[in-house]
Amino acid sequence: MIVSNSINQMFEEMRGWRHELHSIPEIGLEEHETSKYIKSKLSEFNIEFKEGYANTGIVARVKGSKGDSDKSIGLRADFDALPMPEKNEFKHKSKNEGMMHACGHDGHTTMLLLSLIHI
């Protein structure tokens, strides 16, 4: 598989994003800090977004550079966590007692952010 150099160069930064998201799990419809973090990344990369869907949801939009088209593609990631204690002991373990990203949403959200940056 060929990985673009620009993506490869962002590996450590992306790992940091995933670790940050992992450390701030929040249950569904209450992901205020998570939503804030995602919006900060979208703003950092000048990606247009709208917020407030289902309380904390975000919709981002990336337009192509080859003219106006009515074609589109949808990508999505959940970013809610599970109401369960985290028993891991790494630096980026959950800061929120009784909540954990145990199903990969921290990784999925990181991959979606990367996709938006590189589309």
Feature locations, PLM:
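Acidic/His- and Gly-rich active-site-bordering loop/insert found
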Residues: 2-101, 110
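Conserved small/polar residues in nucleotide/adenosyl-binding loops
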Residues: 117-119
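Active-site signature of alpha/beta-hydrolase-fold catalytic machinery across serine-
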Residues: 114
